[in-house]
């Protein structure tokens, strides 16, 4: 069985991507965020360096995956880089990858809108880490090194009241996630096993989707691509304001170069928004 996972930050169309696979590829199981999702405490454990707890929980996912009688398993879960990437490759060293990249300004705004919406309907967002503090299930913890430059803490994200702080929180999460993506590809020499998607554009292009399937040597069910499936659409359109662009620029001006240098190289320089890092 071939396994494909995603390198991505979330709010990048990954639910729809899972449908593209299961609707178009023969003998394929396509999942988005299957149980165990690896959000919540596994994200906390990753930051705390507790691989053993992650490994113990991930074993349950492995057992489920191995029971599928199929040639291809695809999981488009953005928890991959947040919690279980280094453990997953222990079990699936031959895994293939899709690097799903979206404009960080829009990712941050989409995350902000989503967070506002979930708080409004009182959706249970939080969990308690092993330190007793509350964290948000689907985000980084705020304890990661990148946040220390700006004196972020988990209370800032949980007790959201400042638009600027929260938007910048999600910008930093995107930057951290992309750095993890490149580090993962370098560490495990996986560049040749990774396909890059520019979203949302590529998700709606038949030629590009076919090229991705060909990259992984997959057999399609039909000659033409079937474009259907659920999307995690928010209530608000993802419109980035001038003020939010200034919030982004402030972050970029203060971040150490070690977080920014990857955006001066491929694949990022091929994106039409790459000049925001200049």
Question: For the regions a protein language model found, what residue spans apply to each?
Answer:
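PAPS-dependent sulfotransferase catalytic core
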Residues: 1-68, 226-241, 268, 273-276
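PAPS/PAP-binding and catalytic site of the sulfotransferase fold
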Residues: 13-26, 87-91, 112, 195-220
